[in-house]
Swiss-Prot record:
Broad class of enzyme this protein falls into: transferase
Protein name: Protoheme IX farnesyltransferase
Enzyme Commission designation: 2.5.1.141
Source species: Erythrobacter litoralis (strain HTCC2594)
Transmembrane residue ranges: 28-48, 50-70, 99-117, 121-138, 146-166, 173-193, 219-239, 241-261, 278-298
Stated role: Converts heme B (protoheme IX) to heme O by substitution of the vinyl group on carbon 2 of heme B porphyrin ring with a hydroxyethyl farnesyl side group.
Family, similarity comment: Belongs to the UbiA prenyltransferase family. Protoheme IX farnesyltransferase subfamily.
Membrane disposition: Multi-pass membrane protein
C-alpha cells in the first residue's frame, strides 16, 4: 500500500488530478464505450448518451486514481511512472484516494439514476475489478495478473451497449471477450521492453516470472486466439461484411506482427523494435476494430437499401 506523499508536497492543481485518471488509457476506454453505445440496437437520447459516456470516463478515472494511490511506492521505483503526481511528491496520498472514491461513487450513482441500474452495476463491477481485484490482489501476486485482470478494461463497450438496451445479450459479451483476449498480447509486448522496471519493484509480470521465451510464445498464442473472437460478431450475423472483413484483416495483421516477437530473443543493446511495433499496433488495432463496428452499424443498412 502507498505511503503518504511528502509533507512538503505542494497543493495539487487540476493537472495533477487529471493525470491521476490516466488520460491516455482513458481515451481508449471512452472510445470503446462510445462504440458499444453507438453499435447497440435502438437509440438513446443524445444527452443521456453523453451522460453514460461521462459516467464511464469518471468510473475509469476514479479506478485509475485509486490504482495510483495504492501503487505510489511501486511507481516511485519505476522510470516509466516515477513522475506521476504521487511518487513525484506533487500530491498528498489522501487527496488522490478521496478523489478516486468520490468520482467512482458519483459515476455509479449518476449512471443508475440517469440511465439504468444494470449499466451502473456493470460499471461498479469494472471499478472494483480494476481498483481492488487487479491492483491489490492480482498484480502483486501472479504472472497471470494481466490475463485475469484483463476483464477490468473489457467492460466499457458492454456498459455502453447496456446503457442503450438495458439488457445483456451475446453481442456485448463478445465485445467484452474481444478486449479480454486482446489485453495479454498488448500488455506483454509492453512488459518485454520495460521488464527491468518490473523486476526492480518486484511485480511478477510474465517476462519476470516465466521468462522471455515463454512470454513471447504466449503473445503469439493469444494473438491467434483473438481471431475467432474478433470475427464472431460477423459469424453469428450480428454485423455485416464491413466489420467482418475489417476484423479479419486487422486481427490477421495483429497475429502476423506477433510472429517476429515470438521467434526472436533479446540481445545486448536491443532496441526492441518488433515488440514496440506490436504494442503500438495493438492500440491502433482496437481503435480501428471498434470504429469498423460502428461504421458497419450505420453503413450496412444504407448499402442494402441502395442495392
Amino acid at each position: 500500500m502507498t505511503t503518504a506523499a511528502s509533507p512538503a508536497a505542494l497543493p495539487a492543481d487540476w493537472r495533477d488530478f487529471f493525470a491521476l485518471t490516466k488520460p491516455r488509457v482513458m481515451t481508449l476506454v471512452i472510445f470503446t464505450g462510445i462504440c458499444g453505445l453507438l453499435a447497440a440496437p435502438g437509440a438513446i437520447n443524445p444527452i443521456l448518451g453523453f451522460t453514460a459516456i461521462l459516467c464511464i470516463a469518471m468510473g475509469a478515472g476514479g479506478s485509475a486514481a485509486l490504482n495510483q494511490w495504492w501503487e505510489a511506492d511501486i511507481d516511485a521505483g519505476m522510470k516509466r511512472t516515477a513522475k506521476r503526481p504521487l511518487p513525484s511528491g506533487r500530491m498528498q496520498a489522501t487527496d488522490a484516494r478521496d478523489f478516486g472514491i468520490l468520482i467512482s461513487v458519483a459515476s455509479v450513482g449518476i449512471m443508475g439514476i440517469a440511465i439504468n441500474w444494470l449499466s451502473a452495476i456493470i460499471l461498479a463491477a469494472a471499478i472494483v475489478y480494476y481498483a481492488v481485484i487487479y491492483t491489490i490482489w492480482l498484480k502483486p501476486r501472479t504472472p497471470q495478473n494481466i490475463v485475469i485482470g484483463g476483464g477490468a478494461g473489457a467492460f466499457p463497450p458492454m456498459i455502453g451497449w447496456v446503457a442503450v438496451t438495458g439488457e445483456i445479450t451475446l453481442m456485448p459479451v463478445l465485445l467484452f471477450a474481444i478486449i479480454f483476449m486482446w489485453t495479454p498480447p498488448h500488455f506483454w509486448a509492453l512488459a518485454l521492453f520495460v521488464k527491468t522496471d518490473y523486476e526492480k519493484v518486484g511485480i511478477p509480470m510474465m517476462p519476470v516470472v516465466k521468462g522471455e521465451a515463454s512470454t513471447r510464445r504466449q503473445i503469439l498464442v493469444y494473438s491467434i486466439l483473438l481471431i475467432p473472437f474478433a470475427v464472431a460478431p460477423w459469424a453469428i450475423g450480428a454485423t455485416g461484411a464491413i466489420y467482418g472483413v475489417s476484423a479479419l484483416l486487422l486481427t490477421g495483421a495483429f497475429a502476423a506482427l506477433s510472429v517476429p516477437v515470438a521467434t526472436r530473443r533479446q540481445i545486448e543493446g536491443d532496441t526492441m523494435k518488433p515488440e514496440k511495433r506490436l504494442f503500438g499496433f495493438s492500440i491502433l488495432y482496437l481503435f480501428a476494430l471498434f470504429a469498423a463496428l460502428v461504421a458497419d452499424r450505420y453503413l450496412t443498412p444504407l448499402i442494402e437499401s441502395a442495392a
